[in-house]
Amino acid sequence: METRERDLERLIPMHKSGASPRDVVLSVPPSPLASPIHVAGKEAIYKVIRSWASKKFMTGCVILLPIAVTFYFTWWFIHFVDGFFSPIYTHLGINMFGLGFVTSITFIFMVGVFMSSWLGASVLSIGEWFIKKMPLVSYIYSASKQISGAISPDQSSGAFKEVAIIRHPHMGEYAFGFITSTVILRGRAGGEELCCVYVPTNHLYLGDIFLISSKDIIRPNLSVREGIEIVISGGMSIPHMLTTLDSETIHRMLESFGILEFGDVCLSLVLAWT
């Protein structure tokens, strides 16, 4: 052992601080050629792990987000509807979650059954007559009724009669809309049938008014419910291919709504808002 120490003293000079030859040998820095490769390997492994973890995390968010949103709004809706009748049951000493919700759903169903009868329609007509006599309430009720009529199961009375595609806001760009009604424009040349086309945002209300010829209106093979789905989903539920309706199909659809009485040119009232 002493012989090895003497050999090290001859090969390596002693440090001024009095460090032993063994400490001097151990304190020699590593080779500069191996360090960058080692660091680059660590960085590459770190980037791969980070990319993999990021992709898996985003995949989990994409899967769980619609589920969480659905459960949240469903839970909120149940609590909201349950709040109508639950105070009555609480006052009676009955504390059971969901009982108010079941009662509310049953009440809505019974109202639908009653209003479908002749007696219910008569009562509704009398109630609407009183509401229309009120200055401010009549406007709110009329607007709300038109919006609710868009999703009415009775398509003959629905506000949205068929889906339309128009060139808006520039040539080469198209927007979805709904034909809501028809009007007649009378002039010196005679009467022209004009179509009201409503182009909503995903909120389905408010907008600007544009006048567009019916020749620029494209009628796709989509139902009103499918059109509403496309608008609400931001275009994500749109089919990969759209086909336009032929003239005979359009003629039959217009006849079913009773709006074929005048000419071929339509005025499109396009309601859109930014």
Swiss-Prot record:
Question: Could you tell me which PANTHER family the record lists for this protein?
Answer: COV-LIKE PROTEIN 1, PROTEIN LIKE COV 3
Question: Upper taxonomic classification of the species?
Answer: Eukaryota, Viridiplantae, Streptophyta, Embryophyta, Tracheophyta
| A GO-annotated cellular component | membrane
Query: Where, per UniProt, does this protein localize?
Result: Membrane
Q: Give the protein name, as stated in the record.
A: Protein LIKE COV 3
Name the protein family. Belongs to the plant COV1 protein family.
Keywords noted in UniProt: Membrane, Transmembrane, Transmembrane helix
* Topological domains annotated Extracellular: 82-93
Residue spans, topological domain Cytoplasmic: 1-60, 115-274
